[in-house]
From Swiss-Prot:
GO terms for biological process: translation. It comes from the Eukaryota. Its main location: plastid. It comes from Stigeoclonium helveticum. One of its GO terms (molecular function) is structural constituent of ribosome. It is found in: Plastid, Chloroplast. Part of the 30S ribosomal subunit. This is Small ribosomal subunit protein uS11c. Belongs to the universal ribosomal protein uS11 family. Pfam families: Ribosomal_S11. One of its GO terms (cellular component) is ribonucleoprotein complex.
Length: 130
């Protein structure tokens, strides 16, 4: 009895023409996640996954790299054409990330600021005495 040879055929991925881009910026890192309309994550990238470590992750250049990686992957593999952008966090690199997503060829329909504002939040740390 001869063995049957099975070919590794990749399953074609579904094309997503509309999606949502979540940009989460913190003081230390930037994370860009691209989802479909339902909210299922399609691809993501972060400054740390772009081989940047330590304080370099907090720069605008790192956010640019992360956004470009995620956007290129979404355009190449899932044919993403237009997206809503939801931005969270106080980081400095938000504008750079948005600009890079637009440069990758994704049409931005809505820009929405989603950062949480505390209603008097946590107690601040004790004042430093020197």
């Amino acid at each position: 009895m001869s063995k049957q040879i099975r070919k590794n055929v990749k399953k074609p991925r579904k094309k997503i023409y509309r999606g949502v881009v979540y940009i989460q910026t913190t003081q230390n890192n930037t994370i860009v996640t691209i989802t479909n309309i339902k909210g299922d994550a399609v691809c993501w990238s972060s400054a740390g996954s772009c081989d940047l470590k330590g304080r370099r992750k907090a720069t605008a250049y790192a956010a640019k790299l992360a956004a470009a990686n995620a956007a290129k992957k979404a355009r190449r593999e899932f044919v993403l054409k237009e997206a809503k952008v939801l931005i969270t966090g106080p980081g400095a690199a938000r504008d750079t990330a948005i600009h890079e997503i637009h440069k990758a060829g994704i049409k931005l329909t809505i820009l929405r600021e989603k950062s949480g504002v505390p209603h008097n939040g946590c107690r601040p740390p004790k004042r430093r005495r020197v």
